[in-house]
Design a protein with these regions (language model features):
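Transmembrane-helix motifs of polytopic, lipid-linked glycan transferases
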Residues: 37, 41, 117-120, 124, ...
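Short acidic/glycine- and proline-prone juxtamembrane loop motifs at membrane-interface regions
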Residues: 58-59, 171-185, 224-227
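Short helix- or helix-capping micro-motifs
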Residues: 40-43, 162-167, 174, 194, ...
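Transmembrane-helix signature of polytopic, membrane-embedded enzymes
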Residues: 101-117, 121, 145-168, 203-209
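Membrane-interface transmembrane helices that cradle and orient dolichyl/undecaprenyl
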Residues: 150-153, 192-210, 221, 240-249
Length: 538
């Protein structure tokens, strides 16, 4: 029988439907692996490609290029943040040189100052090595985000769709593809949330190891940026809930040892990182340079004696170096400005206030932007998640009727309340910080992730309570994934430093202004003769 002319098209459509049907009806374990791998592939494509664009330092890279140069030379130093993130950057640079990248580029002068002008970069410098570790950590974060939602909702396809909130989040992409610290902090924070889910409302198989893993991940996150300390609240919620349900003396003793394992692991990793920082940088700072003079002024005598080879490495040396590091960070914090044109009010962060243009370049006809703008669809869903969580938690207090799925419903609501409490504490804590120093929208990244988790969990609860939502769950999830991806693609030129005309830029300002389209002036600012001093933005 001769096939009709349109048979190939219909055959392809049928094959596509069959594939989707097999995927949807695959056994749960297979589907989890397939979709988890797809999340990693998408994250690699979004975060790891074209890392040398723009081929200029932007935002805090102006600080971190100088910090990593001193790491490369093994010079003792202090910074505005703990040392772990800089160690990862240094590892990326050294790995790059193993492959010949930047091997013949003279970068020595970068270590003489604490900050360079973003346009004063060695000729031929490739940014891929210093940015690669951050991008790879972002890929790990994508997988962790998928696993967290899988743990919350228990369904692979649902976890995959909501993990797109991370994979296609333009704000995460533009910031995590750069040589910034936030990707490392974010990865360890997500790891701590995943481990916490194995402790909250259930008995772990190896409780002391599980709680210790939570403390270790909190410690790693803290050793990138200190505001991660607020995540300890999750561990406190697990311990507090266990004590609330069982007041017996044996249970108090169990929770004491679990809390001790959290604290012990945290202190162990902090001690280890500071020890490595001392060991990796055995050379005294060059006091003839601005950076060296500033670092030397913050160092204690015991640490100076070690650097001068007058004493061996010992706990006293590590302690003195750590105390000096703390004093340096504290001084930097108290010296922060409280307002700045790119700064934002933490109370407005859930509304994406406000985006930052890290850099723009004009070629005479078109302009390329590195613009820290979020995916509006994602942020809208995050805002819905926060509001829905507040409403559902309030209704729970008045809705005590028994249902066939009462046990699963209780677990979902307990997790929702814990995550909502964590979000509120994180948000209020940063509102408080905003009184004392300038804050930026990327400081909200952990809170944004928590809002996405709230949205995913609220969807699960609503699907269980509302039959209409449950019947059309697949269609709703497919529609969400299309909207998320389409919004990401629309704003991608601002994310990836792609050249656009001013008209194309203005399209991104409909219906509200999200980016100031450049050039606003005909001539760019002149290159300064020497780096201009500035306060740390991080």
């Amino acid at each position: 029988m001769t096939p009709a002319p349109n048979m190939p098209a219909s055959s392809f459509a049928q094959k596509a439907r069959d594939f989707v049907d097999r995927l949807w009806n695959a056994d749960d374990k297979t589907l989890r692996w397939i979709l988890g791998a797809l999340v990693v592939v998408l994250a690699c494509f979004n975060f790891v490609r074209d890392l040398d664009n723009p081929a200029h330092a932007f935002w805090d890279e102006s600080y971190y290029l100088t910090t990593t140069q001193r790491y490369e030379e093994g010079k003792a130093q202090y910074a505005s943040h703990p040392p772990l993130g800089f160690m990862f950057m240094d590892a990326g640079i050294k790995t790059g040189k193993m492959f010949g990248i930047n091997k013949n580029v003279d970068t020595h002068f970068l270590g003489d100052v604490k900050k360079i002008d973003s346009r004063v970069v060695p000729k031929g410098y490739d940014f891929t090595p210093i940015r690669m570790p951050s991008a790879l950590f972002a890929v790990i974060s994508a997988l962790l985000f998928y696993l967290i939602i899988l743990r919350l909702n228990g369904e692979a396809f649902e976890a995959f769709v909501f993990s797109l909130l991370f994979v296609f989040e333009n704000a995460y992409i533009v910031h995590f593809r750069a040589a910034h610290l936030d990707s490392y902090q974010f990865t360890f924070t997500l790891g701590s949330i995943l481990v916490w889910l194995y402790t909250f409302g259930r008995e772990p198989k190896r409780p002391l190891l599980t709680y210790a893993a939570f403390g270790l991940l909190c410690g790693l996150s803290f050793m990138v940026k200190v505001n991660s300390l607020v995540m300890f609240l999750l561990g406190a919620l697990s311990l507090g809930r266990a004590l609330w349900l069982d007041h017996s003396r044996p249970n108090w003793l169990r929770q004491f040892w679990r809390g001790s394992s959290i604290a012990g692991a945290f202190l162990a990793v902090v001690t280890l990182i500071f020890t490595l920082h001392v060991v990796f940088n055995p050379n005294a700072p060059d006091t003839k340079t601005k950076a060296g003079a500033r670092d030397n002024g913050a160092m204690g005598q015991v640490y100076k004696d070690y650097l001068a080879h007058k004493r061996d490495l010992s706990p006293a040396v590590v302690w003195d170096a750590t105390v000096g590091y703390y004093k340096y960070m504290k001084y930097d914090f108290t010296g922060e400005v409280k307002t700045e044109p790119n700064g934002s009010q933490p109370v407005l962060w859930p509304f994406m206030a406000k985006a930052i243009t890290y850099r723009w370049d004009f070629d005479g006809k078109k302009t390329a932007y590195t613009h820290m703008l979020g995916n509006p669809i994602n942020w809208g869903l995050g805002l819905v998640g926060i509001a829905a969580a507040a409403v559902l938690i309030s209704r729970r207090r008045f809705d005590r009727k028994e249902t066939p799925d009462a046990e699963a419903r209780t677990v979902d609501f307990d997790r929702l309340e814990a995550l909502f409490a964590m979000f509120m504490v994180f948000w209020v804590f940063h509102i408080y910080l905003g009184i004392h120093r300038v804050m930026y929208i990327y400081h909200y990244f952990i809170g944004l992730a928590l809002s996405y988790l709230l949205a995913a969990l609220c969807f699960r609860i609503l699907a269980r309570q509302i039959p209409l939502v449950n019947r059309h769950r697949f269609s709703i999830l497919c529609g969400l994934s299309v909207l998320i991806a389409a919004s990401y693609l629309f704003y991608a030129p601002l994310t990836y430093h792609q050249y656009m005309t001013k008209t194309e830029c203005n399209w991104r300002n409909i219906p509200v202004t999200l980016v100031v389209c450049q050039p606003a002036k005909k001539k760019p600012a002149a290159l300064p003769a020497k780096p201009s001093p500035s306060l740390n933005k991080s």
